[in-house]
């Protein structure tokens, strides 16, 4: 120091970092000897001063931060609000956990930042402050736990415990906090001893991989380098990357060279690079060295110990292994010190600079609605968004970066310092993330229900795991279940009404609840809001049209179950249960028109003699127009046409045409209705043959006599088939209308009677100015069977008239005697319909008539769905008979009397008018094949609660859909709780007939024509979104077990024109807690609307669980879940805990190449593209070489960045060249393909990349291999030395294989020489090796070996490869391949 270097005199307090910089400068100026002398003086000075000051720690020195109280209180308030939102179903468990953690972490972090200023202001010479902030002992985290708060803890798996420790160690911990603290600190894998051994094993494996890497040359002569751009990385990392390296190319500024190739880079040169902002710099690294099993001085660069180029013979491999392994060993101790305390990062916030109105460009391309990771609604910016805040006197412009959440609306007023945006927590805040599964467990017992508008496709076809496509709620509908143990009998029978209290008494005999595969669901039919049905009919309607218009065709289930005699329904007094065929068995069948259709009234109440179902027998079906006749004219009887009266949604049977004869006749004819303008090509009363053109685009299907009638706006063209007979003068025919001659009435042996054995229809035809003649038309005879064989339709015990409820069968002919029947566009015409009438004996003692209540039970046993229709007799107040046909009373529900007819399982007979809370539950038995152990589900009334009354609710459950201008369909919306009871009245409007294949006959059908009977039966079904679907009769009905609604393929005509009047509350609707449906009405609890009445609703309590896309739902729809069952699993990202505990396994994962995402997807794609193009340019031999090299180089860069990221996130600085040496070894092998090179290497043999290149050049043939990434363990077992491998692992296997192959160990590494006791080839022992290599170099070589075409291509390949690599590193904006940047 006396030599006098002009040093600047500084007078300021310095910390540990400043001392490090000072020592570095001292070494540069004075060298090692002088620096060590200076440091000795500093050390002596420090000890002397510390002794004189006599610093000691006492409990009084721990000063608590004054602002802690209100900070903790504020955090608690936020947690409470969050808990409430979670309970309401607004945020799901992961969002709640994430926000809770961030709230407490932000509080803890704020306290930590307050700590240093607090000490400075109150007591700058506090011993705790001096020690920790000088770096002498302890760190900020430990002091924070002493005087701030311990904060959030990690559990042994590294998961966060969301209950924070609010106390600090100065105040002392409560019992709960102490247990959480212990749980986080020393348990399981977090334990220090375990981690230390892991770190030691990692060091051993690392050294094993690189122990033979020694500096053995000065220059390998490589021309390649790796580019580093100062513009692409932070300055600090740029300096760390360059210092100590050697340049691979000359560096020019303009035409002036400022640094030459092979020059090492010091601090001065780096500063010049930064100052001039020059182009990317190409440097030499261990990756570019051409040596196979060692390294040269220039590719390694400066030695980190003394700052000069590394000496020959230095064992750089072992230094690299130790440098990476040692921080792991050291840092495991940190776990114990911080005690598993969570450290992470929170998102950065953008705050408003002043009060004012915020404005931005609300464009869907720029922003779209989203949920933040805390579940709050926000706008997600897809690119940079310019935001303006207009205050009174100034405009503030802010730019919100892409992928950020905007938390305010456009034109909203914001206050100063209000958070307006949340910047995505990227690399700057959360250093380290991982994907974690979080299971959510049910905290109550009940049935599982999914939102009806979400279809959950199973992940696997037969599993019970479903993925969620969009955000929706999962509901657990409350309801108890129990399973009897071993008892073959039960106190209750199936479907009994029961009291909930009896269940509690019985539960003593029941075992604990257990899961069961059989599930049951129950559907209720309930009344809707009252609404008068508008009468949209025009005055021109005839009586017949009114009948068609009001005929309800509520097609609920297509067919009655015929097979499965083991599922016979139980029958008891006052009850009838009918099995309905499940649609799973019918999935592949087309819908048969002959199926039994069950009709249910709107409110589920049957009156006496109500129609339960009807059956269309296919034998009585025809596709042609014609006339029906009941025997001869005098023999038929027409009962008065009352039809089916729609009375409060109940179909009472009143006969239309009922036959008294056992057979009837059908006279077919062909009818064409043509528009007025059409040109007819046949004359009236002319005879034509089959397939004759009768109009421009119309041909006849049958031959016969043509009758043409002109009507007002159309032409009716009839074709009568048959034979013409000209009567003699003796035959007097005095009738013009036709007469029916049934079979067997004429002369028995005459020719005519044999010819017309089915009977004939005789019709007299009188053409103008011509002789009249008689037309004999063929007749089809239909015999009516004596009743239908019900045994094949219903279980036999239902048809017997026992007890007091029975089914009666009535056949009737749909059309009147002599009435013409017209076909409409290829639909078949049903001539006879069979009605099943529900009847029971009138109880003479009771003053009120009984009604029957219908409901569906769906039982799911062993994967099969069985539907049962249950009908119960109940007492109901009788209505005045005079009001029955009153048109004003034809609404859905018009007065309060109907409320009490709405029987459901929560109303028992004697307590009908009381609140459901005091009423009974229903017990239902699951159909179990194991008869000894039936499973029960109890739905008690205590799970329901009643809200009401509503005074100002004005709404009607009517959904309107307009198909054309005048056509209005009225649909009675009485969807059951699970969305199943779809009941729709088919409609006719004034001008429009809609047939099965949507042919509109508007032009040809007028009001006069409508007096004839057309059979148009149209069914409409409504899905859960309120759209109305028209089912195609040829489509398959699929019962979707996910939402139990009938689905049909929609027709486009109806989709566009639907309009819905939304209702306030509808049956089956789910209501979240605190919702309010009336203006001053009560706040509801969360649940499902079960009953809606004029003044009240009944809601079944349910617990909502919010689930976001990508979540996995466990279990099936309608499955019974027990307390503690898994409902849903979320997949989410979370930040890692702050200890090396989590960092070390991650390093190991990367080094052992276990991680799936060790090479990013972009990189894989880029490699594939490169391989394709290169192969196309150069052909296969060189294409393989360059493709493999490029893959290896890119994966090396990616691996180095990954490992550095882990260590830097832990605050550990490791020089890149150490990691590069390790990565070079694990990426230096290639796998020989099975085709090619079979005469040199074995297929699938692992060989070094450089060896494969050289062999290919020597043999002058194509090389087939691919890059292969080995972990450090496998690399240690695939070296050139079998002695080294055997001393590492699997000694016997390695030695046996080496003996069989006859392997030779050349003893090039350190370990094998140590094992056999030789001199290791490093340091002084290195000189013998160098001497040998000089002799080796004196062997004469063939100078012309590389001449000719191969040499040219090879050099071309080298230049191309270098330019491609450098280009690739700089021209990829989405992921620049900077070598040493922690992205």
From Swiss-Prot:
Q: Give the cofactor note text.
A: Binds 1 Zn(2+) ion per subunit.
**Coiled-coil spans in chain:** none
- One biological process term in Gene Ontology: DNA-templated transcription
Q: Which reaction does it catalyse?
A: RNA(n) + a ribonucleoside 5'-triphosphate = RNA(n+1) + diphosphate
CC cofactor:
Zn(2+)
Q: Primary place of residence?
A: plastid
Enumerate the subcellular locations listed in this protein's record, separating them with semicolons: Plastid, Chloroplast
Matches recorded under Pfam families: RNA_pol_Rpb1_4, RNA_pol_Rpb1_5
Which SUPFAM superfamilies has this protein been placed in?
beta and beta-prime subunits of DNA dependent RNA-polymerase (SSF64484)
Cite the EC number: 2.7.7.6
Cellular component per GO?
Answer: chloroplast; DNA-directed RNA polymerase complex; mitochondrion
Q: What's the top EC group for this one?
A: transferase
Q: Which GO molecular function annotations are given, in alphabetical order? A: DNA binding; DNA-directed RNA polymerase activity; zinc ion binding
- Which CDD domains does this entry report, sorted A to Z? RNAP_beta'_C
* Residues engaged in binding Zn(2+): 220, 289, 296, 299
Alphabetical keyword list: Chloroplast, DNA-directed RNA polymerase, Metal-binding, Nucleotidyltransferase, Plastid, Transcription, Transferase, Zinc
Please report which protein family the annotation says this sequence is part of: Belongs to the RNA polymerase beta' chain family. RpoC2 subfamily.
Q: What does this protein do?
A: DNA-dependent RNA polymerase catalyzes the transcription of DNA into RNA using the four ribonucleoside triphosphates as substrates.
Q: How does it assemble?
A: In plastids the minimal PEP RNA polymerase catalytic core is composed of four subunits: alpha, beta, beta', and beta''. When a (nuclear-encoded) sigma factor is associated with the core the holoenzyme is formed, which can initiate transcription.
- Name this protein carries in UniProt: DNA-directed RNA polymerase subunit beta''
Q: Please tell me the species this chain comes from.
A: Oenothera parviflora (Small-flowered evening primrose)
């Amino acid at each position: 120091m006396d030599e006098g270097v002009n040093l600047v005199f500084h007078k300021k307090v310095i910390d540990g970092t400043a001392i490090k910089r000072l020592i570095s400068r001292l070494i540069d100026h004075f060298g090692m000897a002088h620096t060590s002398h200076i440091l000795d003086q500093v050390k002596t000075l420090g000890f002397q001063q510390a002794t004189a000051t006599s610093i000691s720690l006492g409990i009084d020195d721990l000063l608590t931060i004054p602002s802690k109280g209100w900070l903790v209180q504020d955090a608690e308030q936020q947690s409470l609000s969050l808990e409430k939102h979670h309970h309401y179903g607004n945020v799901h468990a992961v969002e709640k956990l994430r926000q809770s953690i961030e709230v407490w972490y932000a509080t803890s972090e704020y306290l930590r930042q307050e700590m240093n200023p607090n000490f400075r202001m109150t007591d700058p010479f506090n011993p705790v402050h001096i020690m920790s902030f000088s770096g002498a002992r302890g760190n900020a985290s430990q002091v924070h736990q002493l005087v701030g708060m311990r904060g959030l803890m990690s559990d042994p798996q590294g998961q966060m415990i969301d209950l924070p420790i609010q106390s600090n160690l100065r105040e002392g911990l409560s019992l709960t906090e102490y247990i959480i603290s212990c749980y986080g600190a020393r348990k399981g894998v977090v334990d220090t001893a375990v981690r230390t051994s892991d770190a030691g094993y990692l060091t051993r494996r690392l050294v094993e991989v690189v122990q033979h890497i020694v500096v053995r040359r000065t220059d390998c002569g490589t021309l390649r380098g790796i580019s580093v751009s100062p513009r692409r990385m932070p300055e600090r990392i740029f300096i760390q990357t360059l210092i100590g390296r050697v340049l691979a190319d000359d560096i020019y500024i303009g035409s002036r060279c400022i640094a030459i190739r092979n020059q090492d880079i010091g601090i001065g040169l780096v500063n010049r690079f930064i100052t001039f902002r020059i182009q990317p710099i190409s440097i030499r690294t261990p990756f570019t060295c051409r040596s196979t099993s060692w390294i040269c001085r220039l590719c390694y660069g400066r030695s980190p110990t003394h700052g000069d180029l590394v000496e020959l013979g230095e064992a750089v491999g072992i230094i690299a292994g130790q440098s990476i392994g040692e921080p792991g060993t050291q840092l495991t101790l940190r776990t114990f010190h911080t005690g598993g305390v969570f450290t992470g990062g929170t998102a950065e916030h953008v705050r408003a600079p002043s009060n004012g109105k915020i404005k931005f460009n609300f464009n869907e391309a720029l922003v779209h609605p989203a949920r933040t990771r805390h579940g709050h609604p926000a706008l997600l910016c897809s690119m940079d968004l310019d935001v303006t805040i207009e205050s009174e006197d100034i405009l503030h412009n802010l730019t919100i970066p892409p992928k950020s959440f905007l938390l305010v609306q456009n034109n909203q007023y914001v206050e100063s310092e209000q958070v307006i945006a949340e910047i995505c927590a990227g690399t700057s805040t959360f250093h380290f993330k991982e994907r974690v599964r979080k299971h959510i467990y049910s905290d109550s017992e009940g049935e599982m229900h999914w939102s009806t508008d979400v279809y959950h496709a199973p992940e696997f076809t037969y599993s019970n795991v479903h993925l969620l496509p969009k955000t929706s709620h999962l509901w657990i509908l409350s309801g108890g279940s129990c399973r009897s143990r071993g008892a073959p009998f039960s106190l209750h029978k199936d479907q009994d009404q029961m009291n909930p209290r009896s269940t509690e008494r019985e539960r003593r005999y029941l075992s604990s609840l257990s899961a069961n595969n059989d599930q049951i669901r129950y559907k209720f039919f309930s009344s809707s809001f009252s609404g008068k049905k508008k009468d949209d009919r025009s005055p021109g309607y005839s009586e017949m049209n009114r009948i068609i218009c009001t005929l309800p065709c509520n097609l609920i289930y297509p067919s009655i179950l015929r097979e499965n005699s083991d599922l016979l329904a139980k029958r008891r007094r006052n009850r009838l249960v009918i099995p309905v065929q499940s649609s799973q068995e019918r999935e592949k069948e087309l819908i048969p028109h002959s199926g039994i259709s069950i009709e249910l009234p709107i409110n589920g109440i049957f009156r006496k003699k109500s129609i339960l179902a009807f059956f269309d027998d296919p034998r009585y079906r025809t596709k042609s127009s014609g006339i029906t006749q009941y025997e001869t004219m005098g023999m038929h009887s027409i009962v008065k046409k009352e039809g089916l009266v729609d009375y409060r949604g109940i179909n009472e049977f009143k006969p239309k045409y009922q036959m008294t004869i056992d057979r009837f006749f059908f006279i077919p004819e062909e009818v064409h209705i043509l528009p007025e303008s059409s040109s007819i090509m046949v004359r009236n009363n002319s005879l034509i043959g089959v397939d004759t053109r009768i109009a421009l685009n119309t041909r006849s299907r049958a031959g016969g006599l043509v009758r043409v009638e002109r009507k007002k706006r159309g032409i009716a063209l009839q074709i009568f088939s048959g034979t013409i007979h000209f009567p003699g003068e003796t035959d007097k025919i005095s009738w013009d209308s036709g007469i029916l001659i049934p079979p067997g009435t004429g002369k028995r042996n005459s020719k005519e009677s044999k010819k017309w054995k089915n009977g004939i229809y005789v019709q007299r035809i009188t053409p103008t100015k011509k002789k009249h003649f008689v037309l004999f038309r063929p007749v089809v005879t239909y015999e009516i069977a004596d009743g239908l064989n019900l045994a094949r339709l219903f279980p036999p015990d239902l048809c017997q008239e026992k007890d007091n409820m029975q089914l009666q069968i009535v056949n009737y002919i749909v059309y009147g005697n002599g009435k013409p029947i017209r076909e409409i566009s290829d639909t078949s015409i049903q001539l006879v319909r069979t009605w099943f009438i529900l009847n029971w004996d009138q109880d003479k003692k009771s003053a009120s008539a009984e009604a029957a209540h219908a409901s569906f039970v769906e039982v799911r046993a062993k994967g099969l769905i069985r539907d049962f229709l249950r009908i119960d007799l109940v007492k109901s107040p009788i209505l005045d008979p005079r009001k029955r046909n009153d048109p004003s009373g034809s609404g859905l529900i018009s007065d309060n009397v109907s409320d009490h007819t709405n029987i459901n399982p929560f109303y028992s007979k004697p307590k009908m008018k009381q609140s459901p809370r005091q009423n009974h539950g229903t017990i239902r038995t699951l159909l179990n094949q194991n008869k000894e152990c039936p499973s029960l589900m109890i739905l008690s009334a205590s799970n329901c609660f009643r809200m009401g009354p509503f005074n100002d609710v004005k709404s009607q459950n009517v959904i309107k859909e307009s198909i054309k201008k005048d056509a209005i369909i009225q649909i009675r919306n009485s969807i059951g709780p699970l969305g199943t009871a779809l009941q729709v009245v088919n409609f006719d409007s004034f001008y429009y007939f809609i047939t099965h294949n949507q042919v509109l006959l508007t032009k040809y059908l007028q009001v006069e024509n409508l007096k004839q009977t057309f059979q148009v039966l149209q069914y409409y079904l409504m899905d859960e979104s309120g759209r109305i679907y028209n089912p195609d009769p040829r489509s398959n009905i699929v019962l979707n077990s996910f939402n139990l609604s009938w689905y049909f393929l929609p027709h486009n005509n109806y989709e566009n024109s639907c309009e819905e009047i939304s209702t306030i509350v509808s049956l089956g609707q789910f209501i979240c807690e605190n919702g309010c449906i009336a203006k001053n009405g009560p706040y509801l609890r969360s649940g499902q609307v079960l009953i809606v009445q004029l003044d009240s609703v009944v809601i079944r309590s349910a617990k909502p669980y919010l689930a976001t896309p990508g979540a996995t739902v466990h279990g099936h729809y309608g499955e019974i879940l027990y307390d503690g069952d898994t409902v849903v699993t979320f997949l989410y990202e979370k930040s890692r805990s702050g200890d090396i505990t989590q960092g070390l396994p991650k390093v190991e994962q990367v080094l052992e190449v276990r991680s799936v995402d060790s090479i990013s997807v972009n990189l894989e794609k880029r490699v594939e593209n490169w391989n394709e193009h290169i192969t196309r340019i150069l052909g296969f031999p060189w294409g393989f070489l360059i493709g493999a090299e490029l893959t290896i180089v890119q994966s090396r860069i990616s691996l180095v960045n990954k490992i550095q990221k882990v260590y830097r996130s832990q605050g550990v600085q490791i020089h890149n060249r150490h990691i590069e040496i390790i990565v070079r070894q694990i990426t230096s092998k290639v796998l020989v393909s099975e085709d090619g090179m079979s005469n040199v290497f074995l297929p699938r043999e692992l060989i070094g990349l450089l060896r494969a290149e050289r062999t290919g050049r020597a043999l002058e043939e194509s090389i087939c291999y691919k890059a292969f990434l080995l972990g450090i363990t496998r690399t240690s077992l695939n070296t050139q030395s079998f002695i080294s491998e055997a001393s590492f692992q699997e000694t016997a296997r390695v030695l046996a294989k080496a003996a069989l192959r006859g392997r030779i160990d050349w003893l090039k590494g350190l370990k094998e020489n140590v094992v056999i006791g030789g001199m290791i080839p490093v340091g002084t022992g290195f000189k013998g090796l160098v001497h040998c290599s000089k002799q080796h170099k004196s062997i004469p070589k063939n100078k012309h070996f590389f001449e000719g075409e191969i040499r040219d291509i090879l050099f071309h390949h080298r230049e191309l490869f270098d330019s491609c690599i450098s280009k690739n590193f700089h021209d990829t904006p989405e992921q620049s391949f900077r070598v040493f940047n922690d992205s």
